[in-house]
């Protein structure tokens, strides 16, 4: 008999230990196989963590141990899904992020390989059958047979489904002129791009590449101004590692950036690339994962979750736009791709390159301390100048355009001039929808999400009110539910309204919009960006998705419609985010041969994040913001952990939060500051009340032990959920 130790996924319970099952079958089963097992009154899928051979029968074992073993129902896999390195990584993440191991394993794997019941219905390997040439001898063939034989010979192979005559095919096979070859099908098609000769490097780029290759640092920060040629540095380094038998993992912070990077890399490495991100179909993810695991792919391009790609001989990990918060996952396990990259680099002997024009304060601080290597690209390629910038004070009556509530006189004039010159424009507003809330003019009622208790945003395109936090949707009402009034007012503005205003002011201009509403439909992002790249539209309107990474050669004007919107958010990172967004947006202008200009509209023109973002003066911003962080004891001067409790009862969630705080205080941990419990900005999640505690600390070891003990103790309680977020971006 074999006893299997199995980690089980359960929707309601945090099962953070293996369960023992008897396996009486004869199938091969090892660590890393999935099995179906009975658990309570359900049949669940789990991962085998160990196999114990025993000479005892099931009955003898139960009699000896006084423990009744349930039996494994079936072994699902024919091969191991997880290698030893992946198990070690999962164990590290489980401990580091205080998350059950099974949940980490779910995060690491594509849908069809997850330890979940739904994965059993997922697509498996797809195949295609080809007709290949065996002999070009035409002797004894009919005219039609010769025609098809020549076609196969010319193309070397054709798909069987394209061979229209079944009888001719069967005859050619019988005469040993052609043969059928069955091959695994790749469901993801990468559009072929003409192979290009690498661009000539600038002196700065040459020095950057040489500096990285000769550095002994495991992690290096590449800080380069917008348009300085960081992408070419990435490509050359990837080429170096590929030529030396290594593989490369290239991460982007948003899916919208993958088409552009795929195009860049496919011009150099077409047959070696695999793609991983959430917009792929389950079948495509499965195919790409298999190509990576088998060693066919040498380069993986993808978003955050691609960090788990099982590349062989990993040599280089690149995080482009490393400062972007989407590298951090919000749901458990709340991992940061950089932390996973560091673990993999250490275990697999790889190097890490972090690239950004506006690095996170934590990364730049480590670079200046010598913890990371530090490389700078201070100039744009071809010695191009940075865009001229003008800050527009929206409180100044002389700036106001009486014919437009959204655009100042200066920005509107500049837009007209750019359009007259057939130049392109980018307009940024980091808020989607038409209006952020709808209120009743008579009684003041504001339409709110029933589960989150925050204002619903109005989307004019589909006449809906939407919650941007939980995706609750309702038809836009015409009557106030409180007083019955029909006088409803749409307050504020989003990207939809910007698009409407542009169309009103410039009716002949062709506009495109790119935000998360547009990107929800697969392929929309690529279509919008390709159209704008091909100059099929004059103006691109969007959220932060359009602010970073894109290289539009004909864009000469950027307008940041409301630059200070993020400064009102309750976050210690609000100034940093605002600075980064302005800097990145301004950097989209003037990347070609024409000079660029940017207009930054704001109600806070003297704020240092706005002023220095307009100048792209990162060094000065870094000094000011680091002083602020030091005074308030926020990262990088301290570490953070947020504890988020949710419960159906408002009183109970507060009581448990106080209990946790008391347990932490009893440990008397040195240099630990406990803030809260407090009710966050979004005070409800899924109709459950929320409270938070924030921990500031400097020594990790003791806090890890205490939090793990608290987590396991509270796991015995029911009716609430606890999320532990290490190094949170927000709280």
Each language-model region and where it sits:
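Inter-lobe coupling/hinge segments of SF2-like helicase ATPases
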Residues: 196-202, 206, 218-654, 661, ...
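Accessory, non-ATPase domains that flank or precede helicase/AAA+ motor cores in DNA-metabolism machines
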Residues: 1-356, 368-384, 667, 694, ...
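Conserved beta/loop motifs at nucleotide-recognition and modification sites
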Residues: 208, 427, 662-666, 670-672
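Basic, glycine-rich polyanion-binding accessory segments appended to enzymes
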Residues: 61-62, 657, 662, 671
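Beta-strand-connecting loop/turn residues
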Residues: 2, 42, 461-463, 687
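Short beta-strand elements
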Residues: 512, 668-680, 720-727
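Short, intrinsically disordered low-complexity segments
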Residues: 43, 673-701
């Amino acid at each position: 008999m074999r006893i299997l130790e199995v980690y089980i996924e359960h929707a309601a319970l945090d099962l953070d230990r293996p369960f023992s099952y008897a396996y009486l079958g004869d199938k091969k089963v090892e660590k890393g196989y999935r099995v179906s097992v009975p658990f309570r009154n359900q049949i669940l899928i789990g991962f085998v963590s160990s196999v114990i051979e025993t000479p005892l029968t099931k009955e003898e074992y139960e009699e000896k141990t006084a423990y009744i073993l349930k039996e494994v129902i079936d072994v699902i896999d024919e091969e191991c899904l997880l290698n030893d390195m992946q198990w070690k990584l999962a164990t590290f993440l489980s401990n580091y992020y205080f998350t059950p191991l099974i949940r980490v394993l779910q995060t690491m794997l594509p849908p069809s390989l997850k330890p979940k019941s739904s994965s059993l219905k997922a697509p498996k390997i797809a195949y295609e059958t080809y007709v290949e040439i065996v002999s070009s001898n035409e002797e004894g063939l009919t005219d039609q047979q010769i025609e098809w034989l020549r076609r196969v010979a010319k193309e070397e192979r054709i798909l069987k489904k394209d061979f229209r005559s079944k009888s001719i095919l069967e005859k050619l096979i019988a005469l040993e002129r052609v043969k059928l070859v069955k091959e695994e099908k790749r469901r993801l098609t990468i559009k072929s791009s003409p192979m290009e000769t690498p661009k000539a490097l600038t002196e700065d780029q040459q020095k950057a590449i040489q500096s990285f290759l000769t550095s002994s640092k495991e992690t290096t920060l590449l800080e380069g101004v917008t348009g300085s040629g960081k992408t070419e540095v990435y490509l050359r380094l990837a080429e170096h590692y590929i030529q030396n038998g290594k593989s490369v993992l290239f991460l982007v912070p948003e899916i919208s950036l993958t088409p552009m990077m795929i195009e860049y890399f496919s011009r150099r490495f077409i047959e070696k690339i695999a793609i991983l991100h959430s917009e792929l179909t389950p079948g495509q993810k499965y195919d790409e994962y298999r190509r990576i695991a088998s060693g066919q792919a040498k380069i993986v391009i993808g978003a955050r979750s691609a960090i788990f790609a099982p590349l062989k001989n990993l040599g280089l990990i690149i995080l482009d736009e490393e400062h972007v918060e989407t590298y951090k996952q919000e749901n458990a396990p709340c991992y940061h791709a950089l932390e996973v990259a560091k673990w993999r680099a250490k275990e697999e002997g790889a190097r890490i390159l972090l690239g950004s024009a506006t690095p996170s304060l934590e990364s730049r601080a480590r670079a200046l301390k010598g913890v990371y290597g530090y490389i700078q690209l201070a100039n744009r390629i071809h010695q191009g100048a940075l865009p001229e910038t003008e800050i527009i004070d929206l409180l100044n009556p002389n700036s106001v355009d009486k014919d437009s509530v959204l655009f100042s006189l200066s920005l509107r004039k500049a837009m007209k001039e750019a359009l007259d010159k057939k130049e392109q424009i980018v307009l940024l507003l980091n808020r989607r929808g038409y209006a952020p809330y709808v209120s009743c003019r008579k009684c003041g009622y504001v339409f709110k999400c029933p589960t989150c208790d925050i204002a619903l945003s109005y989307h004019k395109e589909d006449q809906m009110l939407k919650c941007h936090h939980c995706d609750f949707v309702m038809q836009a009402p015409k009557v106030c539910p409180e007083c019955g009034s029909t006088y409803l007012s749409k307050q504020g503005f989003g990207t939809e309204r910007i698009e409407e205003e542009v169309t009103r002011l410039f009716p002949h201009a062709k506009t495109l919009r790119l935000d998360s509403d547009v990107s929800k439909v697969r392929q929309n992002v690529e279509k919008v960006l390709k159209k704008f790249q091909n100059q099929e539209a004059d103006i691109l309107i969007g959220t932060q998705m359009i602010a970073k990474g894109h290289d539009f050669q004909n864009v000469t004007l950027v307008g940041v419609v409301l630059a200070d919107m993020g400064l009102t958010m309750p976050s210690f990172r609000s100034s940093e985010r605002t600075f980064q967004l302005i800097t990145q947006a301004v950097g989209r202008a003037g990347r070609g041969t024409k000079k660029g200009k940017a207009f930054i509209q704001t109600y806070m023109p003297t704020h240092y994040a706005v002023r220095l973002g307009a100048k792209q003066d990162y060094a000065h911003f870094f000094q000011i913001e680091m002083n602020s962080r030091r005074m308030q004891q926020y990262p990088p001067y301290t570490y953070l952990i947020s504890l988020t409790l949710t419960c159906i009862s408002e009183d109970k969630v507060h009581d448990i939060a106080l209990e946790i705080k008391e347990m932490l205080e009893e440990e008397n941990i040195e240099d630990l500051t406990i803030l809260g419990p407090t009710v966050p900005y979004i005070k409800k999640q899924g109709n459950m009340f929320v409270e938070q505690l924030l921990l500031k600390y400097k020594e990790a070891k003791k806090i890890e032990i205490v939090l793990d003990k608290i987590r396991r103790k509270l796991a015995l309680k029911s009716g609430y959920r606890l999320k532990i977020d290490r190094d949170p971006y927000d709280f």
